[in-house]
Amino acid sequence: MSLSHLYRDGEGRIDDDDDERENFEITDWDLQNEFNPNRQRHWQTKEEATYGVWAERDSDDERPSFGGKRARDYSAPVNFISAGLKKGAAEEAELEDSDDEERPVKQDDFPKDFGPRKLKTGGNFKPSQKGFAGGTKSFMDFGSWERHTKGIGQKLLQKMGYVPGRGLGKNAQGIINPIEAKQRKGKGAVGAYGSERTTQSMQDFPVVDSEEEAEEEFQKGLSQWRKDPSGSKKKPKYSYKTVEELKAKGRISKKLTAPQKELSQVKVIDMTGREQKVYYSYSQISHKHNVPDDGLPLQSQQLPQSGKEAKAPGFALPELEHNLQLLIDLTEQEIIQNDRQLQYERDMVVNLFHELEKMTEVLDHEERVISNLSKVLEMVEECERRMQPDCSNPLTLDECARIFETLQDKYYEEYRMSDRVDLAVAIVYPLMKEYFKEWDPLKDCTYGTEIISKWKSLLENDQLLSHGGQDLSADAFHRLIWEVWMPFVRNIVTQWQPRNCDPMVDFLDSWVHIIPVWILDNILDQLIFPKLQKEVENWNPLTDTVPIHSWIHPWLPLMQARLEPLYSPIRSKLSSALQKWHPSDSSAKLILQPWKDVFTPGSWEAFMVKNIVPKLGMCLGELVINPHQQHMDAFYWVIDWEGMISVSSLVGLLEKHFFPKWLQVLCSWLSNSPNYEEITKWYLGWKSMFSDQVLAHPSVKDKFNEALDIMNRAVSSNVGAYMQPGARENIAYLTHTERRKDFQYEATRERREAENMAQRGIGVAASSVPMNFKDLIETKAEEHNIVFMPVIGKRHEGKQLYTFGRIVIYIDRGVVFVQGEKTWVPTSLQSLIDMAK
């Protein structure tokens, strides 16, 4: 029996020194490494099979290589091993699988070169000194000298704010416990004995390194291709992806999607690799790196290994892995696309459901429209049948209105969209003409207003009304009024007399809110105004007994500015009639007074100045002033025109024709030893003849003040003063009283004007509007650049004194008093401004 199989290596080969032969028996190793491209090619020699571990090795074996064997250390003691049977392939595979798992590695597994060599005399030699692998002393007594010092370091740290038990740093972010060291079990390199992390490191940094995780996953995946060495059937761990996870991811790979049509037939030459490759679409380029290149050298796929003898890595099937991964990706993309298609179909169902509802609503609406149109057509045909002459039950206007009301209320949409013009022309117009056949508008102006108002709401086009149009072809009501109602009005206007205006005015007032605006304008412009213009041309103010305003003014609310062309001939005729007029004739005032508010202010003032004021001046010039026997008729004739002529024109007449004679008579009277009481009464009597508006005029005020000055000078002179005791005081009191009244009136008027300006928002801003007379004076001073300020420490009768420019004044109950030569004199605000300038 051959014992060669006892010395056969794991590869099933027996090597000799000169010749080598290979046993052709199939072993487990052959089956396992059948597809392994990285299996070892070394054959066992005959010497190795004979002498076993005592076989001499060639120098080639001792050179550095990527293998897991190491050179023997002959300085180490001799360790005898039993000459047992060589392990079979299955047992060796079990050992290799067990090596893949993490296990504590013994120190003997590594070369002795990692630690310092020690002299050993035998297998049982024991060193006399125990220590750590590096030959260093124990760290147990490190820093023991600190126990014999005074702890200056601790004290310095405490002075700098260190709190025992807390970390260093401003925010105590330093570590509290010192870094914990872990003693390595043997003399191997770092990582040879597994993880060297301490308990403190696991607590402070619980996160596992990503490289360690990747290595663990790789080892687990690699071990799935090998048989479990323990013989137990361990279930492999699989990573599953649920459909929900794929839906959440929801991304479709661009590599797996169908290429675009325009890029699917493009020829591409790839020269980036070792050899030229031709692709027939861009989509193929995206897949070129998924399949590994064939023929890669074995050395490029092997990683250098050091340490113990490396075992053969598990063989890889990249094509199989690629195909499996491609199937997985295609399945995932199919799931995602199916989910999207399902969602699309669901949305389409919802959309179609809504469209079905809309179409159902449209269908119902169309059915209702068809039904309504059928009913409307029946009603129209009924009206047409009853409009026939031989019908026993003819249609009346009220019944027709009710039919149209039914159409408008129940079938509004169809009625609004229908051609109401043609329908009204065919049905309503004949009935309306029959209704107004015997109508006289001037006798019964309200006839038909109710029925026309009803038809207005039925026939008028709201859209046309909002645009203000007058298209007869688009609005049935406008056409009805123009073709049916308007002919009756034309016939009446041709027979109407303009002087009898009331019936026509009442008629148009009754219909103004019913008929369209453009029809009313046509009536006024084309029918009424020509009749009035012709009648004005025939009017004679001297012979006609009926005043012209009695038949012109009633048209003002309706025609307004349309009557402007009539005013010029009316003024011309009135001016001709006033050429021989005398102010004693009051009829002229009665004729002209109604026109004052009709004519414009400019034209009215020009008419008065041209025709009335000269006549009044002549009358006032004929007035004789006699204190003993006064005739006031001429004065009354002139004053009676106040309000008709302007105040300025009236004051001009008084200044020219009245006050010179009046002052002359006063001077003559004072020079003849008069009775001052009679003069006072005469003065007050003439002053009472004028209105407050005339007295407030500065010219009239100056004339009366001049009369007071004449009276004061007369009583102040020695001549005749002794003849009447108390006359001087009476005249002075009269002067003071009159001037005070004038100034109070002036102040009140100015204050009222200031308040009106404030209310209208005209002038100064609201914040600067004067609230009292002092503020008004201050505002006027600012406007005229005049200094207005109080005099410090100066008062008169308890009133504060002020400087207004160069003048000293004080204010008492809304009246300004100016300091004169001997006394304080009241004055107006305008006079104060003039004196200050």
UniProtKB/Swiss-Prot annotation:
Q: Which domain of life is it from?
A: Eukaryota
Q: Which residues lie in Acidic residues bias regions?
A: 91-102
Q: What are the start and end residues of every segment in region (Required for nuclear speckle localization)?
A: 710-734
One GO term of the cellular component aspect? U2-type post-mRNA release spliceosomal complex
**Cellular localisation:** Cytoplasm; Nucleus
Instruction: Tell me which residues make up the G-patch domain.
Output: 149-195
Keywords from the named record: Biomineralization, Cytoplasm, mRNA processing, mRNA splicing, Nucleus, Phosphoprotein, Spliceosome
Task: Write one Pfam family the protein is assigned to.
Answer: TIP_N
GO MF annotations, alphabetized:
nucleic acid binding
Q: Where is this motif: Nuclear localization signal?
A: 700-705
Mostly located where? cytoplasm
Q: Does Cytoplasm show up as a keyword for this record? A: yes
Q: Which residues carry this modification: Phosphoserine?
A: S2, S59, S98, S144, S210
Q: Where is this region: Disordered?
A: 1-21, 53-72, 85-133, 179-236
Q: Which InterPro entries match?
A: G_patch_dom, GCFC_dom, STIP/TFIP11_N, TFP11, TFP11/STIP/Ntr1
Compositionally biased residues, Basic and acidic residues = 1-13, 53-64, 103-116
Q: Which GO terms describe its biological process?
A: biomineral tissue development; spliceosomal complex disassembly
Which stretch is the leader sequence? none
Described function: Involved in pre-mRNA splicing, specifically in spliceosome disassembly during late-stage splicing events. Intron turnover seems to proceed through reactions in two lariat-intron associated complexes termed Intron Large (IL) and Intron Small (IS). In cooperation with DHX15 seems to mediate the transition of the U2, U5 and U6 snRNP-containing IL complex to the snRNP-free IS complex leading to efficient debranching and turnover of excised introns. May play a role in the differentiation of ameloblasts and odontoblasts or in the forming of the enamel extracellular matrix.
Q: How does it assemble?
A: Identified in the spliceosome C complex. Found in the Intron Large (IL) complex, a post-mRNA release spliceosomal complex containing the excised intron, U2, U5 and U6 snRNPs, and splicing factors. Interacts with TUFT1. Interacts with DHX15; indicative for a recruitment of DHX15 to the IL complex. Interacts with GCFC2.
Q: Which family does it belong to?
A: Belongs to the TFP11/STIP family.
State what protein this is by name.
Tuftelin-interacting protein 11
What lineage is on file? Eukaryota, Metazoa, Chordata, Craniata, Vertebrata
